[in-house]
């Protein structure tokens, strides 16, 4: 198993921990594939009833691995990453995100793709992609409006302004704010409470709720977002901005 994630099962809960050496949990191609593989395996495991995705104290994830993107950005890599991200988003069992510190870019989008989000007081959510000359590429433009509404979404995406835990709770991105020392325990206890309920009722309820809040043209919207994202990251402006960021 990679050093970038830890996958384990405790009682009836699958636990996926993002764990890079620097604690920032930048999402590489390999990390995303391994998260998707672990989540899919847990979804198919009859013992597992709910899944937790968590990072560390400093960050849930600071976003895409910039150095990897500078070295290797091409359509086939992106398509693979899209497929793996959607495997995470399409898990049928309830998924809980336990967020401490930064959840930026694809890290923010991964939290949005989860069903319940618990956050510590230090959590910070944002999407700085436009400053690089590109757009959110993994579902934020389609999933965020269902959570925060048009005006708040426009401000976050168009200005890149980050949102702290309190604001995220008020706008519905976060279910509850939990003191850091209790964050994982509360996520785990919630997962185990879900595990005690009948599988069919839980999983059907999740699917019905997702259907109710989703854009009826979600798949079409995601496809448009994907194509625009591919086009934007192929631009000279994006590549130069990304190279400048990698040098910092």
What are these regions (language model features)?
Residues 1-56:
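Conserved CoA-thioester-binding segment of acyl-CoA-metabolizing enzymes
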Residues 1-11, 160-166, 181, 185, ...:
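C-terminal alpha-helix plus adjacent terminal tail
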Residues 16, 20, 34-35, 53, ...:
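Terminal peptide-recognition signature
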Residues 26-29, 62, 71, 158, ...:
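Phosphate-coordinating loops and pocket residues in cytosolic domains that bind phosphorylated ligands
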Residues 32, 66, 81, 141, ...:
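A general structural signal for well-ordered alpha-helical segments in protein cores
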Residues 33-37, 44-47, 55-90, 103, ...:
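Glycine- (often His-adjacent) and acidic-residue-rich active-site loop
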Residues 89-200:
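Crotonase-fold acyl-CoA enzyme core
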């Amino acid at each position: 198993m990679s050093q970038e994630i830890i996958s384990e099962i405790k009682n009836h809960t699958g636990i996926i921990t993002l764990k890079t050496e620097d604690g920032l949990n930048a999402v590489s191609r390999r990390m995303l594939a391994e998260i998707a593989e672990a989540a899919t395996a847990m979804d198919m495991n009859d013992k597992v009833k709910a899944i937790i995705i968590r990072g560390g104290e400093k960050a849930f994830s600071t976003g895409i691995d910039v150095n990897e993107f500078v070295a290797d950005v091409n359509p086939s890599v992106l398509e693979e990453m899209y497929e793996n991200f959607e495997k995470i988003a399409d898990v049928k069992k309830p998924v809980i995100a336990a967020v401490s510190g930064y959840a930026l870019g694809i890290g923010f989008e991964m939290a949005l793709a989860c069903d319940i989000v618990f956050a510590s007081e230090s959590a910070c959510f944002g999407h700085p992609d436009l400053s690089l000359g590109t757009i959110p590429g993994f579902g934020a433009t389609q999933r965020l409006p269902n959570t925060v509404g048009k005006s708040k979404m426009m401000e976050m995406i168009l200005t890149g302004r980050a949102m702290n835990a309190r604001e995220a709770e008020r706008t519905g991105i976060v279910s509850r704010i939990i003191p850091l020392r209790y964050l994982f325990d509360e996520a785990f206890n919630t997962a185990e409470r879900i595990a005690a309920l009948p599988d069919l009722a839980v999983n059907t309820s999740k699917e019905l709720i997702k259907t109710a809040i989703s854009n009826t043209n979600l798949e079409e919207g995601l496809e448009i977002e994907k194509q625009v994202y591919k086009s934007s990251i192929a631009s000279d402006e994006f590549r130069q901005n990304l190279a400048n960021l990698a040098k910092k």
